[in-house]
């Protein structure tokens, strides 16, 4: 029972870290990275499709993304979708190839993105702490139902706290790395 609670807590905390990684990857750093365009939806074949499903996105150089539409008729729609997204990017097309230059970040936008990254990291910490709270509540319930002793509960609670501390440290490390990326000129 205790092992099930710990295993469940570890899995849920791991999912919080994965979500943090995805969220941090979508924050622009001034360098070209395909995940920047993950939020872009293109009207194609009767519905809004994620850009990465209707085109191949590659990094051409440090500051340019190259997009090749799978269907050449979608090039204009892809370009329009990128322009109307809130990413502040200006694509230029040449036939079926669309190039998206990454504008250099100003000091103000760097600080804004750093604040956004900090908020995302804080949300991940809250999620990890909520998992800890749930696990501790489950342990208390087992103790109340006399399925485990108070000593076992205390030992398991200490292990869950160590697990929480480990995941919070991972979150801090991921944020520090992103912050370093954002503030590098």
From Swiss-Prot:
Key word Protein biosynthesis present: yes
Pfam family name, one: RRF
Keywords annotated in UniProt: Cytoplasm, Protein biosynthesis
InterPro entries: Ribosome_recyc_fac, Ribosome_recyc_fac_dom, RRF_sf
Gene Ontology CC, one term: cytosol
Coiled coil: none
Family: Belongs to the RRF family.
Protein's UniProt name: Ribosome-recycling factor
Species, as recorded: Pseudomonas entomophila (strain L48)
Gene behind this protein: frr
């Amino acid at each position: 029972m205790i092992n099930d609670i710990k295993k469940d807590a570890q899995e849920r905390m791991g999912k919080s870290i994965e979500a943090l990684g995805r969220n941090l990857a979508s924050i622009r750093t001034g360098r070209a990275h395909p995940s920047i365009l993950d939020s872009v939806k293109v009207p194609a074949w009767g519905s809004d499709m994620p850009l990465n499903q209707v085109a191949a996105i590659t990094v051409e150089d440090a500051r340019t993304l190259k997009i090749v539409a799978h269907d050449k008729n979608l090039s204009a729609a892809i370009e329009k979708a990128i322009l109307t997204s809130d990413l502040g990017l200006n694509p230029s097309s040449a036939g079926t190839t669309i190039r998206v230059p990454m504008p250099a970040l100003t000091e103000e936008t760097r600080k804004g993105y750093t604040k956004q990254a900090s908020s995302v990291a804080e949300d991940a910490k809250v999620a990890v702490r909520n998992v800890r709270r749930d696990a501790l509540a489950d342990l208390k319930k087992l103790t109340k139902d006399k399925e485990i002793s108070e000593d076992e509960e205390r030992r398991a609670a200490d292990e869950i706290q160590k697990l929480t501390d480990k995941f919070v440290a991972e979150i801090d490390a991921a944020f520090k790395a992103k912050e370093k990326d954002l503030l590098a000129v």
